Amino acid sequence: MSVAPPAPSPPPFDPTKPSTPISFPIKTLQDLKSRSYFDSFHYPFNRSSVPLRRNIGALSDRPRLLVCHDMKGGYVDDKWVQGCGNNAGYAIWDWYLMDVFVYFSHSLVTLPPPCWTNTAHRHGVKVLGTFITEWDEGKATCKELLATKESAQMYAERLAELAAALGFDGWLINIENVIDEVQIPNLMVFVSHLTKVMHSSVPGGLVIWYDSVTIDGHLAWQDQLTENNKPFFDICDGIFMNYTWKENYPKASAEIAGDRKYDVYMGIDVFGRGTYGGGQWTANVALDLLKSSNVSAAIFAPGWVYETEQPPDFYTAQNKWWSLVEKSWGIVQTYPQVLPFYSDFNQGLGSHTSLGGRKLSEAPWYNISCQSLQPFLEFNEGRNSETIQVTVDGREASYNGGGNVSFRGKLKRNAHFTARLFKPQLQLSAAPISIFFSVKSDKRSELSILLHFSSPSQEKKSMLMVPNESINRFGDMFLPCLLTSKQTTSGWTVHETNLVLDGHTLTEISAFCSRPDDLTEETNTLEYFALLGHISIKSQQKAKVYPLASSWVIEAHHVKFVPGDSGSKTLSCKLEWRLKHPEEDSVFPKYNVYAENLSSSEYRPRKVMEEPRSEKVFLGTAHVDAYYVSEMVVGSDVKGVRFVVQTCGEDGSWQELDASPNLVVEVERVSSKLCCCGLI
């Protein structure tokens, strides 16, 4: 009986070789010192593309909320920069409750995957990477790191350079090992120099010290601000306290910190390991105490909900857990604050992908970079059949992306129901604004948008955007706002209205559920179902104009064909594009990438798309000006592949495919050996 030999081990990861873009940490001081990360094929893909939502310098002068990721060791589904197919991956969407997000792993230098920085920045949340040393290996690392004052400064500068280049906001420093007391002065140099360089290289840069090693070099978690850890606190932007503190520690720490009490972040371990209040479903007990003690909080490992598979399902359990945080801590972010404003309620994962109501793909996907501004939905426990349940739903139809807000339940004939969507602080001028939103509903359900305003004299106004036939019913309750509506072929209705409210501030956006006037059923209470696909607010004076296809240079690099079965091949290549003459307003948040197979009769290179010849297949979304096509199967009859790059605007608009830049890669004849070609 013969035994098949074991399959060969995959070759070790070589970051300099072309492959599907991933995020990864830096594991050694040598790699940090050599700056080898910048030579990686993956580096350009790992740059975040979304600046902090507003120019936030110093953090707000109030108790703040820091959230430390720590989910299954880090770099799971989120390591795939262009996304992956696991739509059951871990995500966070309650960004309006937090000020700072830390991406954590146990590698020496944890670089946040760009998806977290992109979506956190979109919501106004700062993002930190982690520098950690632990136990005996960490002691040896620190001995090298802190050998001289110059080495301490050099490594600090390397960390600051990485944050600036990749677009995140700073570092959590966690030295969890003993330090030779003689090296403590150089540790102080490392922390103070890193703080100084971060402040000068990244606007609003932030360095936070973890309560671990003490000023005498002992590994002794203090759990509060003391003379043993305060010297580190004094030379950086804050301290993340270990999570085994006692009831009186927060107030005592606030007294010692004085004017910097909000820079003290008391740790809460959501797993409940020795943490005050027990963590888990009673994490709010600790939050309540910290709020009353007038210090900040640091939530560690909220992925507990996901890792322990809390019932009934991740989505429900996640919303329930974060609702406890909201009740204790309150909302700390407001958006929108500037125009344009756009949200399609995308949570960064879904079971399909749509554009303008048309499905581009039925494939499940996960890409947190695609998460749009998240609604401030209120969590209501229990499925009360007599009320309307409001949820973000990735299974039902989407107008754009893979999400929507779903309204399901029962509603009486003459009743209405409102649900909070956003808490803006949007100052309006004399310039008219346009508001768009898309709805898909059954004939018995009507969905509108309710806007709340505050005048310069603090007078409150509410304006309901309703179709013309419904104005009489609600005119005595709200100021009516006429809509124009356009039906799409996919069953979505896109509503539009224009407003001028000079000097007013938009303070809330809500959904408004009601029944149509021409309801024929005699039953008083009926099932209600409607989907809200997107909402967009933009200035009429700034209509998006997309560059012509001829304005772009698009290239293919690292083109590789590998023979497959029955004459087929796989194609891998890196697509890159740039404007020939970039302008100030030529920065785009994302690009949709498509591929179109060309037979011999269809193949001819051209600069501009003409009549569509064959189906263009959606490949994915890029958030930088490059996309890696990995092992795409090309049939034996295909002579060329046309790649199309569709530019998308921050107002939710997109360039028509026929006007988008494109490039044809000619399919080579390949033998049984690997065949590669270079620049197309």
From Swiss-Prot:
Keywords: Cytoplasm, Glycosidase, Hydrolase. GO terms for cellular component: cytoplasm; cytosol; vacuole. Residues 1-15 have a biased composition (Pro residues). Gene3D superfamilies: Galactose-binding domain-like, Glycosidases. One of its GO terms (biological process) is protein deglycosylation. Its main location: cytoplasm. The keyword Ubl conjugation does not apply. Its EC number is 3.2.1.96. Optimum pH is 6.0-7.0. Belongs to the glycosyl hydrolase 85 family. This is Cytosolic endo-beta-N-acetylglucosaminidase 1. The lineage of its organism: Eukaryota, Viridiplantae, Streptophyta, Embryophyta, Tracheophyta. The gene is ENGASE1.
